[in-house]
Amino acid sequence: MPSLYLASASPRRRELLTQIGVPLSVLVTAIDESPLPNEAPAAYVERLARGKAAAGLAMLEGRGEDGCVLGADTSVVIDGRILGKPVDQADGLAMLAALSGREHQVLTAVALAAAGGVEARVVECRVRFRQVAPEEALRYWQSGEPADKAGGYAIQGLGAIFVSRIEGSYSAVVGLPLCETAELLREFGIPCWQPVGGNPP
């Protein structure tokens, strides 16, 4: 069975893979995450997921090791505009104001790379926020949670109270669509429900 490497420092993605019984090692890769001119959001997240997986595989091959590398990327999209991680407080508050009382898209791409090639899936979800008062948004920003989150919120954290409805995969909004990820892993010969950390699933 191939070893799985996660090309991400995201603790959320690591926890999701552990949840479905997939042992892994973490590889930290760095790629240029700037959108290309006129790049569609779905194409953007898929390109980044593939790029992270390919960069991780190149790192493995450079060490003379084999394995499968998983890359993923999540973006929040509203009015066709990609909301990345906020650069500062003003940016974070502007994101929350844009999302307040409205529906937005969350796009998550997952890619698996091995010596035989790269396969990817893109999953779209729709999330609706209730109205978020400015003072709430400020308190939320001051919690520290939004600073490193795409779109400036975490559905699995304190930001859950803003979400009135979700259509699609909850785990994809968190950062990894588990149904599609499990299908990809199976294609690459990696089963779910393995013992992780010495405990049976």
From Swiss-Prot:
Q: Where is the active site?
A: D73
Question: What molecular functions are annotated in GO for this chain?
Answer: dTTP diphosphatase activity; nucleoside triphosphate diphosphatase activity; UTP diphosphatase activity
Show the disulfide pairing.
none
Which reaction(s) does its UniProt entry say it catalyses?
A: dTTP + H2O = dTMP + diphosphate + H(+); UTP + H2O = UMP + diphosphate + H(+)
Question: Which SUPFAM superfamilies does this one have?
Answer: ITPase-like
User: What are its GO biological-process terms?
Assistant: nucleotide metabolic process
Which cellular compartments is it found in? Cytoplasm
Q: CDD domains from the entry?
A: Maf
Q: What is its EC number?
A: 3.6.1.9
One Pfam family cited in the UniProt record for this chain: Maf
Q: Which cofactor does this sequence's record say it needs?
A: a divalent metal cation
Gene Ontology terms: cellular component: cytoplasm
* Top EC class of this enzyme: hydrolase
Tell me which residues are marked as the site Important for substrate specificity: R12, T74, Q156
Transmembrane segments annotated in the record for this chain: none
Going by the UniProt record, its keywords in alphabetical order are:
Cytoplasm, Hydrolase, Nucleotide metabolism
Q: Which domain of life is it from?
A: Bacteria
Could you tell me what this protein does?
Nucleoside triphosphate pyrophosphatase that hydrolyzes dTTP and UTP. May have a dual role in cell division arrest and in preventing the incorporation of modified nucleotides into cellular nucleic acids.
Protein family (similarity comment): Belongs to the Maf family. YhdE subfamily.
Q: Can you say what this protein is called?
A: dTTP/UTP pyrophosphatase
Top-level taxonomy: Bacteria, Pseudomonadati, Pseudomonadota, Gammaproteobacteria, Pseudomonadales
